[in-house]
Amino acid sequence: MTISTYPLFESHDDFVDQDFTVCRSSIRSVNDYLESFDEELLAIDGYLAARTYLRHYAENPLTFSTYRCQVERLLLWSLNILKKPITQLKRLDAEAFLEFCKNPPASWVGPIIRNRFLDNKDSTTTLAHPVVINSKWRPFTQKTPKQFRGDLVNSDDQVSQGYHSSKGSMGNVFKICSGFYEYLIEEDLAGTNPFRKVNKKNQYNATPDEGAVTRALTPLQWDYVLETAEAMAAAEPNKHERTLFILITMFSMYLRISDIAGRSNWKPTMGDFRRDQEGNWWFHVIGKGNKSAKIAVRDDYVTGYLTRYRRFLGLSPLPEYQEKTPLITTLSGRSGLSDRQVRALLQAVFDNALNRMRTEDREAYEMDSLRAASSHWLRHTSATFDAPFRNAKDLQSDLRHSNLATTQNTYYHSHDQERAHSVKRLGLRDRG
């Protein structure tokens, strides 16, 4: 049986220019393709997760193309071959995918690299579909001698004879796909990294991910993000007081998306803020693995933002005992938001902050990492800022890390800027 495999992601320039607050592809035919899969495969959710991951590597067109190639293949394979949501893969699935990449079927291999999308020449549909999927595109390309490539441009031939992935190529597959699942775990979208458990990792020549960015904002970037959210709230309070509250709540308490959007068995309420006998505030959550925990709440958050949002909602300044008011609601007042909706709201803040930095002529190096920021960066950023001032054990408890070493290895080191400045002006002579 021939399985239709279509490109899911744009060229580099079109990819970076799209509106990432929209939870759909910028190309309608891609949306139609994703919607053609059974609902339980969560094709659109998988696509959005992959899109955000790829955004981390969009600064360099060549790096982006490399990462897009591997993640796109994995998503297409999980939907078409495995028929399983990409967020639910296990070790055996990862091993099966790696074997698949060594010798893909003929229908997945093309003789030359082709354009992913083409201008729609059909005047009756061009308004709705300005570009369409190139049906000749394939996820894999067989290396063809240069002198024969011209003859293949208009060919429909699919080539798999002699297709072999090199050890270096398989190392890229392993490294990039493993990095993708580490990202999914951070974003609370997957429970495990199936590639981390693969047997005989050394055969894939896996190397550290040198293209990864530090997933924390700089102090300057955070100032812009917070100021932008406050400006959005001032300009459109009915729409963005909630956005500001979500942003500052996640940042203040190192929260994951699920801590604020909720889980199937738990939805956060204002009553989850509780004050102890000494007047300290705690936020009670049901986290990963259905583990209950409490997180210390800083005074600045309570007096500056929690009370502000509650007054905006017409509530008493502070949460009451066993209060059932949902922590966040839709604009119409319905309880709760989906994690996808929360991500979109935060993405709008990041994008607007980046636009402000551009408008104010900030240097490129000051903005670069903000282009890749996602909701989980708030947790990392806050912990990075707070680590120099907090006991490691206390920070571990509020981050809900099971292992103290994880907290120490991740946050108890200098910020890159501080590290650079600590050596920048040290001379090489007269050090006595």
Predicted regions and their residues:
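Conserved tyrosine-mediated DNA breakage-rejoining catalytic core shared by Y-recombinases
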Residues: 262-308, 314
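Short pre-functional
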Residues: 178-182, 241-261, 283, 385
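C-terminal catalytic core of Y-nucleophile DNA break-rejoin enzymes
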Residues: 287-307, 323-350, 372-374
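N-terminal core-binding DNA-recognition domain of tyrosine recombinases/integrases
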Residues: 47-65, 72-212, 232-233
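Catalytic-site neighborhood detector that most strongly recognizes the C-terminal catalytic loop/helix
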Residues: 399-424
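C-terminal secondary-structure termini that scaffold catalytic or DNA-interacting sites
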Residues: 425-432
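Short, basic (Lys/Arg/His-rich) helix/loop patches that form interaction surfaces
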Residues: 343-397, 404-405
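Basic, Lys/Arg- and aromatic-enriched nucleic-acid-binding interface segment
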Residues: 164-167, 224-257
